[in-house]
């Protein structure tokens, strides 16, 4: 892959194109119909118990729309149950029996993924996850749009 002239966005997409298929294949190897994007939802529900979509989106750092789409897929695939909340417009999500049964295999795979990430970190000489967290924090303090406006045009 020749990324000599790639810019930040292209490099970030290329990185995800390297990571996501490998993780998806690991789940297929376990005979699980599971997507990496389900992980933050499952982990949050494991930690907090049943949640409204709004609260889950906030906890996962996703937009309400993105979380709603992911949750719909997870309900369809049998990973979550959705119930109507106190307000008939809100849905309360909780882990399904399928999710609870698969947790040991998923947790083992999450640990393997973390070990693989540490191997990458060792090759890089720094934690990629920490670099990404730091970048997101910096952008939270001063968004990229502001940085673009502050950069002189030549």
Please identify what each model-predicted range represents.
Residues 1, 123-154:
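C-terminal regulatory/oligomerization modules of transcriptional regulators
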Residues 16, 43-47, 107:
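Short, locally clustered residues in the helix-turn-helix/winged-helix DNA-binding domain
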């Amino acid at each position: 892959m020749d990324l000599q002239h790639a810019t930040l966005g292209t490099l970030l997409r290329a990185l995800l194109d390297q990571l996501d298929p490998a993780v998806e294949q690991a789940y297929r190897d376990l005979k699980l119909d599971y997507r990496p994007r389900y992980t933050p939802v499952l982990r949050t529900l494991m930690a907090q118990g049943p949640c409204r979509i709004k609260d889950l989106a906030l906890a996962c750092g996703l937009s309400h729309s993105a979380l709603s789409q992911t949750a719909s897929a997870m309900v369809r695939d049998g990973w979550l149950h959705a119930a109507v909340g106190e307000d008939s417009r809100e849905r309360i999500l909780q882990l399904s029996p399928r999710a609870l049964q698969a947790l040991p295999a998923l947790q083992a795979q999450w640990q393997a993924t973390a070990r693989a990430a540490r191997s990458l970190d060792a090759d890089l000489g720094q934690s990629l996850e920490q670099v990404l967290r730091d970048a997101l924090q910096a952008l939270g303090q001063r968004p990229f749009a502001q940085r673009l406006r502050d950069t002189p045009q030549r």
